UniProtKB/Swiss-Prot annotation:
CDD domains: UGPase_prokaryotic
UniProt cross-references to Pfam families, sorted A to Z: NTP_transferase
InterPro entries for the chain: GalU_uridylyltTrfase_bac/arc, NTP_transferase_dom, Nucleotide-diphossugar_trans
NCBIfam families: galU
GO molecular function, one term: UTP:glucose-1-phosphate uridylyltransferase activity
UniProt superkingdom: Bacteria
Catalytic activities: alpha-D-glucose 1-phosphate + UTP + H(+) = UDP-alpha-D-glucose + diphosphate
Record keywords: Carbohydrate metabolism, Nucleotidyltransferase, Transferase
Protein name: UTP--glucose-1-phosphate uridylyltransferase 1
Function in brief: Catalyzes the formation of UDP-glucose from glucose-1-phosphate and UTP. This is an intermediate step in the biosynthesis of diglucosyl-diacylglycerol (Glc2-DAG), i.e. a glycolipid found in the membrane, which is also used as a membrane anchor for lipoteichoic acid (LTA).
Protein EC: 2.7.7.9
Lineage of origin: Bacteria, Bacillati, Bacillota, Bacilli, Bacillales
Similarity comment: Belongs to the UDPGP type 2 family.
Membrane-crossing residue ranges in chain numbering: none
């Protein structure tokens, strides 16, 4: 079955970016001239996703407004002859069929995914988390979709990380592999330093069969007092093989401040308009 739907969880409090996120959704913080969540939506659209449901929470209305039509703004831009800006505004309003559901309680990623179950129905679906922007010739989520079409099994996107970073991620304990596709012995959510079974970290891209909702509904509270998606995937894997796929692409961590700043600089250095001036500025402060 073709994958046409995607879930983007965006209900988190964004505490790492306080006080900036006290009144503004973390997902609306910009990398250059686009909010981070737009990069995620664009990846889904480039992969052929048609319907996107964003799981939001309190004080997240700005996300809905961003992907909605802004007729008054469009009229002003048209009257002033600012055609480039007009096109960019219209573009963000027409990326995909956008839907929204609110996660009323902060019960974790697994609960956020479960909240969107009525939208998904009995179809396989994609999940894209907003903490990582991935640039690749083939969109990261599309790579996973291709693997799903081949195997018919749930696929978890992974990439290698340094051993000292494994405690920050869900980690897979891989078994057999074929062309970067791994069967998995177990999934470990944020292992203690020095205890990780590998350096293959789960990187916020998933293609899941709808069976996962049954496991999420029964899932007990896990690490951090939350319903963990990784725990539900572990139970699914015990009854129906779940694969990990080491996808290609350059990953940018925008889920914490240092990574966010690095990403902004890296994107600026790739921008034709900004590259020269930013390069000269960096040289000037390093003298």
């Amino acid at each position: 079955m073709k994958i046409k739907k995607a879930i983007i969880p965006a209900a988190g409090l964004g505490t790492r970016f306080l006080p900036a996120t006290k009144a503004m959704p973390k997902e609306m913080l910009p990398i250059l001239d686009k909010p981070t969540i737009q990069y995620i939506v664009e990846e889904a659209v480039a992969a052929g996703i048609e319907d996107i449901i964003i799981v939001t929470g309190k004080h997240k209305r700005a996300i809905e407004d961003h992907f909605d039509n802004q007729k008054e703004l469009e009229m002003i831009l048209e009257e002033k002859g600012k055609s480039d800006l007009l096109q960019s505004v219209k573009y963000s309003s027409n990326l995909a069929n956008m839907f929204y559901v609110r996660q009323k309680e902060q019960k974790g990623l697994g609960h956020a995914i479960w909240t969107a179950r009525q939208f998904i129905g009995n179809e396989p679906f994609a999940v894209l988390l907003g903490d990582d922007i991935v640039q690749a010739d083939t969109p990261a989520i599309k790579q996973l979709m291709n693997q799903y079409e081949t195997t018919g099994k749930s696929i978890i996107g992974v990439q290698q990380v340094n051993e000292i970073e494994t405690h920050r991620y869900g980690i897979v304990d891989p078994e057999e592999s074929y062309n970067e596709l791994f069967s998995v012995n177990k999934f470990v959510e944020k292992p203690e330093i020095g205890t990780a079974p590998s350096n293959l970290a789960i990187m916020g891209r998933y293609v899941l069969k709808p069976d996962i909702f049954d496991y999420l509904e029964r899932q007990e509270i896990g690490r951090g007092g939350e319903i963990q998606l990784t725990d539900a995937i572990e139970h699914l894997n015990s009854e129906d093989c779940v694969y990990a796929y080491n996808f290609e692409g350059e990953r940018y961590d925008v889920g914490e401040k240092i990574g966010f700043v690095k990403t902004t600089i890296q994107f600026a250095l790739k921008d034709d308009y900004m590259k020269k001036e930013i390069t000269e500025f960096i040289k000037s402060i390093n003298k």
